[in-house]
């Protein structure tokens, strides 16, 4: 956890959760953005009808989760949505890289999801992604995924700047 920047180990004191830093946020989300762009492009080419149905179900689960106001449940539903796209890419190395980033991204995702004002936008982006992936519209799906992650960067950066996370 220390190597991933999630925990600070303080000699003779123990460990504490590391603060989210803007630079760290940008670094992690730049990598995520590049990997998720590739993932959505490959998913547009390879997704099966079953995976499309799973994606639709995951989007519905996300909608239901956001009504609970349980941040953990909402974050897990969002992770599951993205996992289906990643699996549909069919690229095991890509999936592995995204899974390796998951813990680092989770903190940022949680901060982002603490603001219920972002939910309608997320739901719309998920629905747009499903439509574009279903119709194999690679360029449009990539644009939506980029916007989706850029919005997260912007929202979490605002949180970092206005308060200590």
Located regions from the model:
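Short linear motifs at protein or domain termini
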Residues: 1-41, 45, 87, 153, ...
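Mobile beta-alpha loop/short-helix "lid" or hinge segments that flank ligand
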Residues: 2-8, 101-103, 117-119
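Conserved amphipathic alpha-helical segments that form helical-bundle/coiled-coil interaction surfaces
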Residues: 28, 32, 40, 46-111, ...
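A short, acidic/glycine-rich surface segment
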Residues: 113-115
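Residue-level signal for the nucleotide or nucleotide-sugar donor/cofactor binding architecture
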Residues: 117, 135-136
